[in-house]
Amino acid sequence: MAQMTVQIVTPDGLIYDHHAAFVSVKTIDGELGILPRHINTIAVLEVDQVKVRRVDDDKHIDWIAVNGGIIEIADNVITIVADSAERARDIDISRAERAKRRAELEIEEAHDKHLIDQERRAKIALQRAINRINVGTRI
């Protein structure tokens, strides 16, 4: 069976490194499903989940919350470089829910005070928190 190597790297180091049969990501241009021997590609990722179907167990799927970044696909090696990323098993759901509530309050406050930049940052924080919650509940 053909396989790919998937590596996810953040400023904190290597977060994920496994062989995969299939990978699904969301780019700014839409969903991208990746199988072995995929054409070489570079794309910008959305804040979303990465789905990795591992080679060692066809039923085993790893879910990773990725907060944007870049994906490079070259010669059956998938490299994702992101500001931050967390595997589903490492996500603290209660912490993510607190971050979500905090971001919602910040959005409301910034909107009321017409602070556009602060509102935009809070919306990004909300999107990241929701992504972490969605991925964290997949285990």
UniProtKB/Swiss-Prot annotation:
Keywords: ATP synthesis, Cell membrane, CF(1), Hydrogen ion transport, Ion transport, Membrane, Transport. It holds the Pfam family ATP-synt_DE_N. GO terms for cellular component: plasma membrane; proton-transporting ATP synthase complex. It is a peripheral membrane protein. The keyword Protein transport does not apply. SUPFAM superfamilies: Epsilon subunit of F1F0-ATP synthase N-terminal domain. Its main location: membrane. GO terms for molecular function: ATP binding; proton-transporting ATP synthase activity, rotational mechanism. It is found in: Cell membrane. InterPro entries: ATP_synth_F1_dsu/esu, ATP_synth_F1_dsu/esu_N, ATP_synth_F1_esu_C, ATPsynth_dsu/esu_N. Produces ATP from ADP in the presence of a proton gradient across the membrane. Belongs to the ATPase epsilon chain family. F-type ATPases have 2 components, CF(1) - the catalytic core - and CF(0) - the membrane proton channel. CF(1) has five subunits: alpha(3), beta(3), gamma(1), delta(1), epsilon(1). CF(0) has three main subunits: a, b and c. This is ATP synthase epsilon chain.
